[in-house]
Amino acid sequence: MAKAKFERVKPHVNIGTIGHVDHGKTTLTAAITTVLAKRGLAQQKRYDEIDNAPEERERGITINTAHVEYETEKRHYAHVDCPGHADYVKNMITGAAQMDGAILVVSAADGPMPQTREHILLARQVGVPYIVVFLNKADMVDDPELMELVEMEVRDLLSTYEFPGDEVPVVAGSALKALECGCGKEDCPWCGKILELMDKVDEYIPTPQRDVDKPFLMPVEDVFTITGRGTVATGRVERGRITIGEEVEIVGLMDAPRKTVVTGLEMFRKVLDEAVAGDNIGALLRGVDRKEIERGQVLAKPGTIKPHRKFFAEVYVLTKEEGGRHTPFFNGYRPQFYFRTTDVTGVIHLPEGVEMVMPGDNVKIHIELITPIAIEEGLRFAIREGGRTVGAGVVTAIEE
């Protein structure tokens, strides 16, 4: 009898190419798919297929992003590449393309440029944890000392933004030459470098922890009472797992978290013993009155998340064309901040030397909410005014 094919499920990692315009990010993306396709690990994508990325909308913001997928011997990758600089800014701030690591592409012929710096800063701010460097256009640099100089410059720049500049893997090659050759052989002077780069990505960027292995958290979407049983909070489990009889905390919209026990779990009217990340559930809570829990709070594993009012964030302000504001805003601007399931009013404080923020800008700001919310670094939010989105942000540091 015919045996079913054994398919090993490889660990999945999200990565992306970042770096200055015209340094070769898209060419490298095409080269990676071309070289790996020769080994049966990818579908070859042409430069123009990647470059003409479709428009997507994330939180009302228009972003052009190309998604390609490929495998190495060890892992499966989803890779994002953006045609324009503004697309990177929006992508990284909205978290439309969450990256577990990034390949920073720097032209060896030009060295680090303004967007190189800006992308490294953004990666630091929004929590891209690991960077691997590809020094592109190495075929245009004859002087090995110049190559070393550029590498040192990139390492210093990474260290400036608190990446381990001395440890970061750096591979020099030519994406264009590899793309033109496309033999995919390890001993090829061009294709070999692409394989070497992917080896470094395999080794250096760790496989991320799966959502289900993180501590339990569920944003509360709705609350109702079951006569004779008690109060039920419904929502989608964002991460972790929860079992009947476990203790949880209700966090947010009040100064201190409140403990309770989950005494029942339901999904689609069926009773569950356990719910995991991605499940839409109703959780029956012991001793909690209907008035003591509301939308906008979260249920969480005790001690894993706290309510906060003051924090720093990196934000992108929508342009008029994206449906955002037509005019700048100033220090003391009071919009709503939409976290998970609810709007909370807050005040924006601009950094010193920044007079105003124009539509289309990205800027680091300080926010003070009027009521505490369950917040942690890396949490995404929308800035809204009268029900329409005028900006997107990510929490970069918590003050109190």
Curated annotation (Swiss-Prot):
Principal location class: cytoplasm
EC class (word): hydrolase
Catalysed reaction, written as an equation: GTP + H2O = GDP + phosphate + H(+)
Annotated region described as G2, given as residue ranges: 60-64
Binding-site residues, GTP: 19-26, 81-85, 136-139
Region of interest: G1: 19-26
Domain tr-type G: 10-209
One family name in Pfam for this protein: GTP_EFTU
Role this protein plays: GTP hydrolase that promotes the GTP-dependent binding of aminoacyl-tRNA to the A-site of ribosomes during protein biosynthesis.
NCBIfam families in UniProt: EF-Tu (TIGR00485), PRK00049.1 (NF000766), PRK12735.1 (NF009372), PRK12736.1 (NF009373), small_GTP (TIGR00231)
Subunit structure, as described in the record: Monomer.
Protein name: Elongation factor Tu 1
Species, as recorded: Carboxydothermus hydrogenoformans (strain ATCC BAA-161 / DSM 6008 / Z-2901)
Gene that this polypeptide is encoded by: tuf1
